[in-house]
Amino acid sequence: MTIDINAIREALPHRYPMLLVDRVLEVSEDEITAIKNVTINEPFFNGHFPQYPVMPGVLIMEALAQTAGVLELSKPENKGKLVFYAGMDKVKFKKQVVPGDQLVMTAKFVKRRGTIAVVEAKAEVDGKLAASGTLTFAIGS
């Protein structure tokens, strides 16, 4: 099942320039794969870096967090709720992400306790790992 930008906008509160998920390619109960098409028109490229544009690593992690957020907030029991980013661990950046790249982002929920969830996430470009880490979320109203 795919999820288009309209359904993503319905699930997430983020809007331009902070909406970093363009389309969901696959979704199951605890795993999601989505894409972000990275273009030179992204506002962060104006300062990071003007002569050598590179997507900031923290925004790659934010895109992964939003990907996981789409999975959680698309569930009927979480409609109208928010997902709060509570932390990230074991983050590694392996490849620069530049204009023209397509980030393929995967998030898999590995642990849940009450309103807290832990996700293993990774972002790839052309099948090569760009970033990975463990993300922690709190689900609230």
From Swiss-Prot:
Catalytic activity field: a (3R)-hydroxyacyl-[ACP] = a (2E)-enoyl-[ACP] + H2O
Transmembrane domains' residue ranges: none
E.C. code: 4.2.1.59
Entry's localization field: Cytoplasm
Gene Ontology annotations for the cellular component aspect, listed alphabetically: cytoplasm; membrane
Keywords: Cytoplasm, Lipid A biosynthesis, Lipid biosynthesis, Lipid metabolism, Lyase
Active-site residues per Swiss-Prot or TrEMBL entry: 48
Coiled-coil region: none
Keyword Cytoplasm: yes
Single GO molecular function: (3R)-hydroxyacyl-[acyl-carrier-protein] dehydratase activity
GO biological process terms, semicolon-separated: fatty acid biosynthetic process; lipid A biosynthetic process
PANTHER family cross-referenced by the UniProt entry: 3-HYDROXYACYL-[ACYL-CARRIER-PROTEIN] DEHYDRATASE
Family, per entry: Belongs to the thioester dehydratase family. FabZ subfamily.
Entry protein name: 3-hydroxyacyl-[acyl-carrier-protein] dehydratase FabZ
Organism for this UniProt entry: Streptococcus thermophilus (strain ATCC BAA-250 / LMG 18311)
